[in-house]
Amino acid sequence: MSKDIATPGRTTEILKKYGFLFKKSLGQNFLIDSNILTRITDTAEITKETNVIEIGPGIGALTEQLAKTANEVVAFEIDQRLLPILDDTLSNYDNVRVVHNDVLKADVAEVITEQFAKPELPLKIVANLPYYVTTPIILKLLHDNIPADSMTFMLQKEVADRISAVPSTKSYGSLTIAIQFYMEAELAFIVPKTVFMPQPNVDSAVIHLKRRKEPLAKVNDEEFFFEVTRASFAQRRKTLWNNLASKFPALKPRKEELIEGLNAIGIDLIRRGETLDIPEFAKLSNFLADFLAEK
């Protein structure tokens, strides 16, 4: 059996063998600490009755750990230069398939059906996400309604803080709401920048997202709900009124009527967006949708 990939020596050996040079544009940072990999698979609760989608396998360090613990692993890799390396490093595992595709452009549901021998098994998504595409990837997976029980991501600590934030904190914002509306979010542990090659400028964190049985609040129009939440954080230091009136100019001539209606459901327009929790944003968006629809 070959040595684990996730060590400084083995990673350097693989990179030299293939003359691989990191592409900064792809945000490539490879893990060189196998203990972190074990903690990731433990956090994700991977078992032999679990299928896993991995995004951005790199040279296969996390993929290898997933292959040891999961039923099957399907990994999306955008960098064609890594395909022969992955063929080599993962040659001992017959339960891994690498798909050369950009997950942002892929039909992930179709890949699940085509690539897994038992697509009916519980699905989990695990990834060491490049910093520059973290948010688009997570939001795509949520909006495409990929049937994953959970998603476990290693990402920039600042982004993990934003995803797992609570109201009235600096990190709380529209990203928090976009994810926590559908998923329970737990920041599992911090990953120091020293366990990557090359070493990034900031620490990372592993976040575990578990799908809720139902969205956290009932909204009449999800698209409008997210439009309202984004508008409410457009300028964080401004009040709800200032941000919403800027987004929806039709509110301006009816300000007093709006204040009265929102006060009746416990929402004061002099508050800032960061003070509202998700159920309050749901009440706000449902009210605004009806209010704006009135002639």
UniProtKB/Swiss-Prot annotation:
The UniProt entry lists the main location of this chain as cytoplasm
Record GO cellular component, one term: cytosol
- Per UniProt, which keywords does this protein have? Cytoplasm, Methyltransferase, RNA-binding, rRNA processing, S-adenosyl-L-methionine, Transferase
Can you state which reaction this protein catalyses?
Answer: adenosine(1518)/adenosine(1519) in 16S rRNA + 4 S-adenosyl-L-methionine = N(6)-dimethyladenosine(1518)/N(6)-dimethyladenosine(1519) in 16S rRNA + 4 S-adenosyl-L-homocysteine + 4 H(+)
Q: Does the keyword Magnesium apply?
A: no
Where does this protein hold S-adenosyl-L-methionine?
Answer: N29, L31, G56, E77, D102, N128
Q: What is its EC number?
A: 2.1.1.182
Write down the PROSITE patterns for this protein, in alphabetical order.
Answer: RRNA_A_DIMETH, SAM_RNA_A_N6_MT
Question: Which Pfam families does UniProt cross-reference here?
Answer: RrnaAD
Question: Which compartments does it reside in?
Answer: Cytoplasm
| Gene Ontology molecular function terms on file | 16S rRNA (adenine(1518)-N(6)/adenine(1519)-N(6))-dimethyltransferase activity; RNA binding
| EC class name | transferase
Which NCBIfam families does its entry note? ksgA
Write down the HAMAP family for this protein, in alphabetical order. 16SrRNA_methyltr_A
The record describes the protein's role as: Specifically dimethylates two adjacent adenosines (A1518 and A1519) in the loop of a conserved hairpin near the 3'-end of 16S rRNA in the 30S particle. May play a critical role in biogenesis of 30S subunits.
- Known PANTHER family for this protein? DIMETHYLADENOSINE TRANSFERASE, DIMETHYLADENOSINE TRANSFERASE-RELATED
Q: Which family does it belong to?
A: Belongs to the class I-like SAM-binding methyltransferase superfamily. rRNA adenine N(6)-methyltransferase family. RsmA subfamily.
Q: What is this protein's name?
A: Ribosomal RNA small subunit methyltransferase A
Species: Listeria innocua serovar 6a (strain ATCC BAA-680 / CLIP 11262)
Q: What is the lineage of its organism?
A: Bacteria, Bacillati, Bacillota, Bacilli, Bacillales
Gene name, Swiss-Prot/TrEMBL: rsmA
